[in-house]
């Protein structure tokens, strides 16, 4: 492991942020810190993860939602101080790593199947 990777690992450990396991196709709720004037509040952004970029400290993901009939995409830095929390609502079953094709789709054709999690038998 080179020096830059080591520094990034130390910085991630110092931040102490726990990011849940999620993948493209999952529906997530991202709580974002929004500053309005002198007060700060949390704003929820719920949508489907259409892309995920795993680059250590520079990891990011794109969330897409439909807001009043208009598609809205927002890119979040995973370790940003503006991201308060990430919660996985629903697991999606997709076969692609990047779901950019959802941009051209609307309505029922943009739906994503739910991933069924198998229960492990206790032996």
From Swiss-Prot:
Gene Ontology CC: cytosolic large ribosomal subunit
Q: Which keywords fit this entry according to its UniProt record?
A: Ribonucleoprotein, Ribosomal protein
Q: Per the record's keyword annotation, is NAD included, yes or no?
A: no
What the entry lists under SUPFAM superfamilies is as follows: Translation proteins SH3-like domain
Tell me its family: Belongs to the bacterial ribosomal protein bL19 family.
Name the record gives this protein: Large ribosomal subunit protein bL19
What function does the entry list?
This protein is located at the 30S-50S ribosomal subunit interface and may play a role in the structure and function of the aminoacyl-tRNA binding site.
Q: Which GO terms describe its molecular function?
A: structural constituent of ribosome
GO process terms (BP): translation
Q: Which InterPro entries match?
A: Ribosomal_bL19, Ribosomal_bL19_CS, Ribosomal_bL19_sf, Translation_prot_SH3-like_sf
Q: What is the lineage of its organism?
A: Bacteria, Pseudomonadati, Pseudomonadota, Betaproteobacteria, Neisseriales
